[in-house]
């Protein structure tokens, strides 16, 4: 590499230093914002349950398996500057829901012969799963270009979960034929969230934005073999209204 080429590279590097330093100290000048997003929550989780009940003076067993699927989410929220120019405190509410099919297998005692169980299977549709979540965030807002800001956030999440499961079985003889009604279970659990929000100003007080966020929690569902994972990776877009 020639001396002239090295000098050019060094000069370019020295010119870039002040610009980089300036970018590191750029101040976010607004007071806060209100946000609305629509997007998709990606990922699915298995839910397996087992339960027993008394029938013909013996014990019957019923097991179910279903896949809690991903779905569309909506979000309302906001944030307000709490320290310096760049740190905001935020809160948002998200809702997502989905339906699933449930595969049911049961071991049903014989009404006449003792200790001669019969295997029965069935399939149900329309098992509902929904998650309402409140996300509390510390957000670091940083202007990165003209009209373009990036917010990095993290904090705890409170999940309010509703889940349809199989908890009982109705047996009709002869056959047997079975009916497995769905029962709604409600649980509240705590998890966390972390994400990035990109905002581009189209007006002085209005921005369009995109969000990528990971949320996680786990809930104890009655009869479930393991805790059910809630949340997932969320990606969406929406609008922001800025407070000056």
Locations of regions flagged by a protein language model:
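Cleavable N-terminal export/targeting peptides
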Residues: 1-30, 244
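Outer-membrane beta-barrel architecture
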Residues: 27-37, 71-75, 86-90, 131-133, ...
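Outer-membrane beta-barrel channels and translocator barrels
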Residues: 29, 83-85, 143-147, 201-205, ...
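Short cationic/low-complexity microdomains
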Residues: 202-218
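Outer-membrane beta-barrel transmembrane strands
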Residues: 25-26, 66-82, 86-96, 126-143
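Residues on the lipid-exposed face of transmembrane beta-strands in outer-membrane beta-barrel proteins
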Residues: 36-40, 74-80, 91, 136-140, ...
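Short glycine/proline- and aromatic-enriched beta-strand/turn motifs that initiate or cap beta-hairpins
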Residues: 23-85, 240-244
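Extracellular/periplasm-exposed beta-strand and loop segments of Gram-negative cell-envelope proteins
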Residues: 43-70, 94-134, 159-189, 217-234
């Amino acid at each position: 590499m020639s001396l002239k080429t090295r000098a050019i590279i060094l000069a370019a590097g020295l010119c870039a230093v002040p610009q980089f330093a300036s970018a590191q100290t750029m101040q976010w000048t607004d007071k806060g914002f209100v946000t609305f997003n629509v997007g998709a929550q990606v990922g699915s989780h298995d839910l397996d349950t087992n339960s027993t009940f008394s029938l013909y003076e013996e014990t019957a067993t019923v097991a179910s398996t279903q896949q809690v699927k991903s779905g569309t989410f909506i979000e309302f929220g906001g944030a307000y500057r709490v320290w310096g120019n760049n740190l905001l405190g935020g809160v948002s509410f998200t809702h997502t829901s989905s339906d699933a099919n449930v595969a049911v297998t049961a071991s049903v005692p014989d009404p006449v012969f003792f200790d001669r169980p019969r295997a029965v299977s069935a399939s149900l549709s329309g098992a509902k799963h929904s998650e309402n979540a409140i996300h509390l965030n510390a957000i670091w807002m940083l202007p990165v270009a003209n009209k373009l800001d990036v917010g990095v956030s993290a904090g705890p999440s409170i999940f309010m979960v509703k889940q349809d499961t199989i908890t009982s079985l109705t047996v009709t003889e002869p056959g047997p034929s079975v009916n497995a009604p769905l029962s709604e279970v409600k649980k509240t659990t705590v998890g966390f969230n972390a994400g990035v929000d990109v905002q581009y100003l189209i007006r002085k007080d209005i921005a369009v934005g995109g969000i990528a966020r990971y949320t996680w929690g786990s809930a104890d569902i009655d009869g479930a073999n393991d805790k059910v994972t809630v949340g997932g990776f969320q990606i969406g877009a929406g609008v922001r209204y800025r407070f000056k």
